[in-house]
Amino acid sequence: MRFLIVFTLLLTASFSIAQPKQNSPYSKFGIGDPVNQFFANSAAWGGQSAAFHDPYHLNIVNPASFAFLRTTSLETGLFAKYSHLTTATSTKDNWSGNLAYAALGFTLRSPINEVLDKTKSPWQFGMGIALTPYSLVGYNVQTIDTLPDLGVVVNSFEGSGGTYRLNWSNAAKYKNTAVGINLGWTFGKSTYENTTTFSDSLPTFFNNRREDVSVNGFIWNIGVQHDFVLKTADNDKTVPLRWITLGVTGEGKHDLKSIYDQLFIRSRGLLSNGTYDDADTLASALVS
């Protein structure tokens, strides 16, 4: 039953996250606009994630936090983004948003069994799985210029896609110290398309350049959290009431593979059906 819930969750999230979600010209560069990996509860604390843990909320930034879970937790999040873009001659306001993440975490040692058995182990274990966007590409920009001897030149720039992270978290805690590891797979495809139209020239010229970049690879990071207990409950010294948490995370070099496809089409002559007669077509692919 738990496997079915996880599978349904990830399948639904993959379709939702993959939908168009933003219009940011800056996402043209690199692999796109980076996406914060912390969830809503951490966002309410200003993105503080290294030392954050909670019995009911998830934190994939520091996997050690999963050992502090005391129940099964299912989290999904939405995001909204407002952009105000300004050029020398115009301004543009844009709202965008989508499903931000879907995650499931659970403890591997039931607190109910501890109550029934009247025993409390110093060991705790937690596990979780999450699907999150890692970077986003999305823009649609058009410029219109009038040049001497060429007339009106229209340049269109469009981009879509992004990269995503499927993450598996595991953690163990002994007394007040927890360690954890994230094992993840990053994948995704981004498309960048530039179109130039010389609409006043005869015959009309139309240049189109499309780049497809696919990225995939294994990533990982580790985390440690330790609670410095300041005060415990009077009737149970194992229950902390006040504490300070120190958390650290680290990661090594990630080996990501990319496939770069490029297509260039130059067309001339506007046909009666509104399409162009292809003049040249060039295609190339690069794997790195």
Residues covered by each model-derived region:
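Subset of outer-membrane beta-barrel
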Residues: 19-288
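Bacterial Sec-dependent N-terminal signal peptides
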Residues: 1-23
